[in-house]
């Protein structure tokens, strides 16, 4: 704990204020550490209580957000409501259980940041990520207010608890997406700085073997932090969040295809619900450019002229090791968190949406036959 660290992400330690972890940043010691207090523990208990109450409320009564005029749609809608609390509880539990690993990750990242003399505060993406999270919170606040007026007509306790759970889920899940995305951006920026340093080293007339070796060790350290440490902390979190996010997108697309939901007001409402969901579903995938950044190091080394010294063997060993590199970031091994997953993701969403529509058509056909 004696290593001085830079504050990598100015919003990362806000996890403690949202009841996710005890992560804190000491301004006097300049380190990330776990600082459990009665207030942080109380917030965590309240958050767990909210989701447990929302889950019990949804189990007590077969609720659905919107009447889909079909048993299939209502059943899936109810499943989405149940998944809201379950997946968020699991995501929170995962992050809470990995909080020590997160501190270790931040300390090691800080050491690499110091080594490469990288300035996190100079990266504008971090501020934009945080501002977008705040904006989405405001959008959902307005949407829930509009939706709640119609949904809470009878003020049933189960509906109130379910709606509160949904609001908490939107705030916490999107913040977890934001934290993960920010960490990926840091890794990507560190690789960019490392590539520039390597480019400078190999462009000199006399290439320093010790300098190149140190640069390649830094490269491996950055990739290792992503493949092991970052995924250990956030891999399970992203997996659980994706499950609900995909189900919610399927439900919204399904509702948009129902009769009576094609007015301009309905389309605007559907878009406002869908846009933030899709944004945070896509964001962790498109921001990951780590593999391409890592390949730049390999491409640069292939252009280094052979000298017949130990430098050649070191470069060949490095290139051989990175020849068949697996996806660097994954949802704990279930799928890659990069652009290659985008097509599969949207294919799955539209496939399951079509299946729901087909079940609804079969249900309507059965009802028509029974009338005769």
From Swiss-Prot:
Alphabetical UniProt keywords: Cell membrane, Membrane, Receptor, Transducer, Transmembrane, Transmembrane helix
Segments passing through the bilayer: 33-53, 60-80, 123-143, 148-168, 225-245, 266-286, 349-368
UniProt GO BP: chemosensory behavior; male courtship behavior; sensory perception of taste; signal transduction
Record's GO cellular component terms: axon; dendrite; membrane; neuronal cell body; plasma membrane
Cytoplasmic side: 1-32, 81-122, 169-224, 287-348
Pfam families associated with the record: 7tm_7 (PF08395)
Topology feature Extracellular, residues: 54-59, 144-147, 246-265, 369
Membrane topology term: Multi-pass membrane protein
One example GO MF annotation: taste receptor activity
Expression by tissue: Expressed in the adult labellar chemosensory neurons. In larvae, is expressed in neurons of the terminal external chemosensory organ, as well as in the dorsal and posterior pharyngeal sense organs.
Record has Lyase as a keyword: no
Protein's recorded name: Gustatory and pheromone receptor 39a, isoform B
């Amino acid at each position: 704990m004696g290593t001085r660290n830079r504050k990598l992400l100015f919003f990362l330690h806000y996890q403690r204020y949202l009841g996710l972890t005890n992560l804190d940043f000491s301004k006097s010691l300049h380190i990330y550490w776990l600082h459990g207090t009665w207030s942080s523990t109380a917030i965590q208990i309240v958050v767990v209580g909210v989701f447990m109450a929302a889950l019990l409320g949804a189990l007590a009564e077969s609720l659905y957000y919107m009447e889909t005029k079909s048993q299939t749609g209502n059943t899936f809608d109810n499943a989405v409501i149940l998944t809201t609390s379950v997946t968020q509880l699991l995501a929170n539990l995962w992050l809470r259980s990995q909080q020590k690993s997160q501190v270790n990750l931040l300390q090691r990242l800080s050491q690499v940041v110091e080594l490469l003399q990288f300035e996190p505060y100079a990266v504008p993406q971090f501020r934009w990520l945080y501002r977008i999270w705040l904006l989405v919170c405001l959008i959902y606040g307005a949407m829930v207010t509009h939706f709640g007026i119609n949904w809470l007509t009878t003020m049933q306790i189960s509906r109130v608890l379910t709606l509160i759970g949904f609001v908490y889920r939107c705030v916490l899940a999107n913040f977890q997406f934001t934290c993960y995305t920010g960490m990926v951006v840091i890794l990507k920026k560190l690789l960019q700085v490392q590539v520039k340093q390597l480019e400078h080293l190999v462009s000199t007339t006399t290439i320093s073997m010790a300098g190149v070796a140190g640069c390649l060790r830094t490269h491996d350290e950055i990739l290792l932090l992503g493949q092991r440490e970052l995924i250990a902390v956030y891999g399970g979190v992203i997996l659980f969040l994706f499950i609900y996010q995909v189900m919610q997108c399927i439900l919204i697309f399904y509702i948009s295809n129902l009769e009576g939901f094609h007015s301009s007001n309905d389309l605007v409402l559907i878009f406002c619900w869908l846009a933030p969901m899709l944004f945070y579903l896509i964001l962790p995938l498109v921001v990951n450019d780590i593999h391409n950044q890592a390949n730049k190091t390999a491409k640069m080394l292939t252009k280094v002229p052979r000298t017949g010294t130990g430098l050649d063997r070191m470069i060949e060993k490095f290139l051989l090791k990175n020849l068949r590199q697996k996806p660097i970031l994954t949802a704990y091994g279930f799928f890659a968190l990069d652009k290659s997953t985008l097509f599969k993701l949207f294919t799955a969403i539209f496939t399951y949406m079509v299946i729901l529509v087909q079940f609804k058509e079969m249900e309507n056909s059965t009802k028509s036959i029974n009338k005769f």
